[in-house]
Amino acid sequence: MSLLPNCFIEYFLPIQTPGDGNCMWHMVSRSLCGNCSLTNLLKDMTVITFFMLEQKFIEIMTIDIRANNKDANEIQLREQATQRFHRAVQVAKTPGEWGDEYHLLALTTFLATKISIYNFYHPNFSKNELLSSFRRAGERQIW
């Protein structure tokens, strides 16, 4: 049924979305209205949010790039961040392209709400049980 490790299946309920590369937007749509009908609108809103907050996103991307590239000067960092920003916009505009944390941040900003879409806790387990189980699984290196 799933390619997830058993330690995930034990604690999470898999939720199926179309396998077209838009899974993040599909999941947000499902959480808003119960189906994937808002997917394209959410992708459009992601693009609009990027453009409305372009300088802020470039600033965030610059910080991310700087963390991994200590030797780059500010001009290089800004150029790389601008390229990354334009790529993020292109991804949001293109059907079937996978979103990332920048797209999730844009959606969170637009919707003015916290988004937790990567998992859905199994109703029989508390969050503390879940976290301690993952900690134990990580110690056993079963990932």
State each model region's role.
Residues 127-143:
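Active-site signature of cysteine proteases
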